[in-house]
Regions:
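Conserved class I S-adenosyl-L-methionine
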Residues: 1-40, 51-55, 72-75, 130-153
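A short acidic, Gly/Pro-enriched loop at the edge of an enzyme's catalytic core
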Residues: 89-100
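C-terminal helical/coil "lid" or tail adjacent to the Rossmann-like core of SAM-dependent
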Residues: 178, 183-234
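Class I SAM-dependent methyltransferase SAM/SAH-binding core
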Residues: 43-45, 49-91
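A short SAM/SAH-binding and catalytic strip from SAM-dependent methyltransferases
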Residues: 99-112
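A short glycine-rich, Lys/Arg-flanked "PGG" loop and its adjoining helix->strand segment in the class I
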Residues: 113-128
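Short alpha-helix
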Residues: 164-178
Length: 249
């Protein structure tokens, strides 16, 4: 079944807020691209624990967040965010939103064609969709270092991809096929300092990868530390794909 990484993804919302706070902190450029207006109704695809959702609300919009992690939805609701536990590809909204937004989510959605069509349906005619995701080349050094460490320890890294790190052309093809026009997608090189260290990043952001490689919980901190030694820096080689598009009026 070609779906989001899992029908519901498991994240530790507290760990994510601690180790991954940079995700929302660096989401300002995508939010500015969305340019939410007072009175608009906006769909936040992959709202996480709701940090950026609240920033949209602060600009006067009404927002519905969706996410496929029960832990993240609980955290978002605790902040007062209107949020639903729902994979992006399963949304059944029809012309309800003036705009849609997504930050650091779409690269997790392997059912990309279905998700693109669902977002398109959710927008009113003339509605816009803006955001950011991991792009082509994202985290190549870190991902390679992790797989090398797994192999040395006798584990088999998963063969199937857990992320869609698209080129601008690949991304545009999917969303134009969904019906969008004026698709503007571009890669942004964004080396990112990981304040809590690469080891914590590995155990938080590559949890699903470690699950699939069947690495025991008791060994994961050790794996993370070894990957940090391999990389030799707390700067992660992030590449973002930033985009904006419109549904025809």
């Amino acid at each position: 079944m070609n779906r989001t990484v899992a029908s519901t993804s498991k994240w530790d919302a507290a760990d994510y807020a601690r180790v991954g706070s940079f995700v929302a902190e660096l989401g300002g450029a995508a939010l500015d691209l969305l340019d939410p207006k007072e009175g608009e109704r906006i769909l936040d695809v992959g709202c996480g624990e709701g940090t950026l959702t609240l920033k949209i609300i602060e600009r006067g919009a009404t927002v519905l967040g969706i996410d496929n992690s029960a832990e993240m939805i609980a955290a978002a609701r605790s902040k007062g965010v209107d949020a639903l536990l729902l994979p992006a590809e399963d949304m059944q909204f029809f012309a309800e939103f003036d705009a849609a937004f997504s930050n650091a989510t779409l690269h997790w959605v392997l059912a990309k064609e279905q998700a693109g069509r669902a977002i398109f349906r959710a927008l009113k005619p003339g509605g816009r969709f803006a955001g950011e995701m991991g792009g082509e080349g994202n985290l190549e050094n870190l991902r390679e270092a992790l797989d090398e460490e797994l192999i040395i320890r006798g584990y088999v890294p998963p063969v199937e991809a857990s992320n869609w790190y698209a080129s601008p052309g690949e991304f545009a093809t999917v969303y134009e096929a969904a019906g969008f026009r004026e698709v503007d997608a571009r890669l942004i090189q964004r080396p990112t300092q990981i304040d809590h260290g690469v080891a914590a990043w590995v155990t938080t952001f590559r949890k699903g990868w470690l699950d699939r490689a069947q690495v025991p919980e008791g060994e994961r901190d050790e794996v993370g530390a070894a990957v940090a030694d391999r990389v030799g820096s707390n700067v992660a080689d992030y590449v973002r794909l930033r985009f904006i598009m419109r549904k025809p009026a």
